[in-house]
């Protein structure tokens, strides 16, 4: 993962953790956890693509990697919808900027994971 994407993840996670969204703080914590999980998954897929012959070890380590990939895409879609919803309802400019950047990052990561997965198939 390039340094811009790493810093984008770190920046968004830090800013999201500082937000106080009232009764929805549990939802926000869930989003933060999923962002972190998505980052780790994206990193591991990227590393797998870089290693020669890693498709076979990936398949042997996890026979259900396609199912796992499908689950990650579902998580991304859920996060995109959740971020869009938050963006629509918030009036705080700090939160709007954070959620717009989070949405952009999610769309970029979704595309990167698609690219990696096609290389592994």
Curated annotation (Swiss-Prot):
This is Nuclear export protein. InterPro entries: Flu_NS2. It holds the Pfam family Flu_NS2. The keyword Translocase does not apply. Average number present in a viral particle is estimated to be 130-200 molecules. Mediates the nuclear export of encapsidated genomic RNAs (ribonucleoproteins, RNPs). Acts as an adapter between viral RNPs complexes and the nuclear export machinery of the cell. Possesses no intrinsic RNA-binding activity, but includes a C-terminal M1-binding domain. This domain is believed to allow recognition of RNPs bound to the protein M1. SUPFAM superfamilies: Nonstructural protein ns2, Nep, M1-binding domain. Belongs to the influenza viruses NEP family. Its main location: virion. It comes from Influenza A virus (strain A/Mallard/New York/6874/1978 H3N2). The gene is NS. It comes from the Viruses. One of its GO terms (cellular component) is host cell nucleus. The keyword Transport applies. One of its GO terms (biological process) is exit of virus from host cell nucleus through nuclear pore.
């Amino acid at each position: 993962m390039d340094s811009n994407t790493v810093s984008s993840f770190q920046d968004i996670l830090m800013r999201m953790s500082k937000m106080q969204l009232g009764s929805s703080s549990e939802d926000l914590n869930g989003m933060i956890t999923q962002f972190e999980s998505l980052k780790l998954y994206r990193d591991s897929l990227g590393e797998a693509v870089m290693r020669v012959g890693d498709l076979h070890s990936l398949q042997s380590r996890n026979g259900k990697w396609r199912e796992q990939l499908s689950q990650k895409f579902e998580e991304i879609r859920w996060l995109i919808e959740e971020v869009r919803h938050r963006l629509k309802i918030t009036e705080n400019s700090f939160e709007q900027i954070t959620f717009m950047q989070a949405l952009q990052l999610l769309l970029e990561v979704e595309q990167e994971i698609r690219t990696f997965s096609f290389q592994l198939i």
